[in-house]
Design a protein with these regions (language model features):
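N-terminal binding-site loop/beta-alpha segment at the start of enzyme catalytic domains
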Residues: 1-75, 114, 142
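Conserved, mostly hydrophobic/aromatic
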Residues: 6, 18, 33, 40, ...
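Short acidic capping loops at alpha-helix termini that bridge into adjacent secondary structure
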Residues: 14-15, 72-75, 79, 114-118, ...
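A cross-domain feature marking catalytic cores of carbohydrate-active enzymes
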Residues: 20, 50-52, 79-81, 123, ...
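A short acidic, helix-capping loop that chelates divalent metal ions and anchors anionic groups
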Residues: 22, 84-90, 213
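Short, acidic/polar
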Residues: 27-40, 94-111, 130-135, 159-163
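Active-site gating/metal-coordination segments in enzymes
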Residues: 87-120, 179, 183
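Beta/alpha (TIM)-barrel catalytic core signal, keyed to glycine-rich beta->alpha loops juxtaposed to Asp/Glu
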Residues: 128-261
Length: 261
């Protein structure tokens, strides 16, 4: 697995990143989850992406357990903040200073690490002044709790505003994590140009449209047993919109091209 720089920084990540959104503590038991992390490491993947909201606080500890014996300087750990978790108290969501500061301490504890390589705003918070959010991120970087800051699913306008404030606060936004695949290309019009303008690169989620682009789902045929599409909870995560016979028929036309590469 090759490595490349993330954004306009000296920080390198593996081209393929291991994410545990719909797997750890949900679709895969803990032993199998740890095995998959070990397999990723053996294949050369060094970057691992999670979030406090994944499996409602339960995904981070599993990833932390799987990585606990790894040399910390040889891996890159990403997490995120925004969504409510646990008991969902009034301040337990969004990008307020209170929630960001408490959330990163929780993530560090669950992951068993002293710092995150990348801490990401999981969404944009329309209820908190952006200045408050960016100041909190700046303080986290200065405290050494996170080395770099990124965002997820921000619009071009939000990226421009956030990057400007970050620069004023003497740090930088280096990444955006949007949904992006051959079946979902909405970021190409404005988000990618805004990201490039601000020295940010994409860490895309669902690049295979949650497995649909693997070609294993066939039109007029039931989803394979134990696949994501056969799991009711997973289907609610977004795969259902790609499972029409029309879409699956079109995807099958890509197989000869894929096999020729």
């Amino acid at each position: 697995v090759k490595h490349r720089y993330l954004g306009n920084s000296g920080f390198k990540v593996s081209e393929l990143t291991y994410g545990n959104w719909l797997t750890h503590a949900r679709q895969v038991d803990n032993k199998e989850a740890i095995k998959t992390v070990k397999a990723a490491l053996e294949s050369g993947i060094t970057s691992f992406d999670t979030a406090d909201a994944y499996a409602n606080l339960e995904a981070e500890p599993i990833l932390g357990q799987a990585l606990k014996n790894e040399r910390r300087s040889g891996i890159e750990i990403f997490s995120k903040v925004f969504w409510p978790v646990a008991d969902k108290k009034p301040n337990d969501h969004g990008l307020s200073r209170k929630h960001i500061m408490e959330s990163i301490d929780g993530s560090l504890s669950r992951l068993g690490t002293d710092y995150l390589d990348l801490y990401q705003a999981h969404r944009y918070d329309h209820e908190t002044p952006l200045e408050e959010t960016m100041q909190a991120f700046a303080d986290i970087v200065r405290a050494g709790k996170a080395l770099y800051i990124g965002v997820s699913e921000w619009t071009a306008e939000q990226i421009n505003a956030g990057a400007k404030l970050a620069k004023e606060l003497k740090f930088q936004l280096i990444s955006n994590q949007p949904q992006y695949s051959m079946l979902w290309r909405v970021i190409e019009g404005e988000v990618i140009p805004a990201s490039k303008k601000n020295g940010m690169t994409q860490i895309v989620w669902s690049p295979l449209a949650q497995g649909v682009l693997t070609g294993k789902y066939l039109p007029g045929t039931a989803a394979p047993e134990d696949s994501r599409a056969s799991n009711t909870e997973a289907a609610a995560g977004g795969i259902a919109k790609y499972m029409s016979d029309e879409a699956l028929t079109a995807i099958q036309k890509l197989k000869p091209l894929a096999e020729s590469l």
